Amino acid sequence: MRNSQTVAALGAFRQQARISHTIANNLSNVQTAGFKRDVSVFNSILSQARNRFQNVGNDTSKISFLPGSTQRTGNALDLAIEGDGFFKVKTTNGIRYTRSGNFGLNKDRVLINAEGLPVLGQRGEITLNGKNIVVEGNGSIKVDGNEVDRIALVTFPTLDALQKEGHTLFQSPSPENETAADRSEILQGALEGSNVNPIQEMLSLLDSHRTYEACIKIIQSDDTLDSKAVNEIGRV
């Protein structure tokens, strides 16, 4: 019969797969502008085994919204946010939020993000007809000296409810709770980099592997005890 340690260890295999996937996804987005790393919160399998819990451990994933480093690009349509604000983009499924500001213009000169989604201003989609484009800290967009719109910057009372969609988009289950990000500023000609620290992720991966190896030992130990028990019964 499997004891509590082995039951927990078996469950940990599935958890380790999810954790490894999370780490791999973080590492693959080290160079993705505005990417926010996922953090796996894993209840140690060894701790559970020592306490003889019957249930396998729980692991949850949360998003780290710590800012990435600001990188100067010199591109007039690259925008970085200083503060806790988000850009708004329009998708076929509704409004989404992002920190990734590597924008461009489509054939109709509508401001779009890297995925081709329209970036929203206070008046809706932003069309930029002109040559000299200036974006001020408060989001005001001037084309050839004339203000055409102001980029919508919003935030939420808490970011815990935001859900990832793809690599750099976020969905809010309660978009009505968005408020103007008055304390945030836009920096033109710059991008916010990913907040992934490759060294930290590799250390997390090593820790995950150590937990995996510990699980192996627990299961092997239990199998050895089972084998001995069967042999003893066979001698009776």
Predicted regions and their residues:
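Amphipathic alpha-helical polymerization modules
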Residues: M1-V236
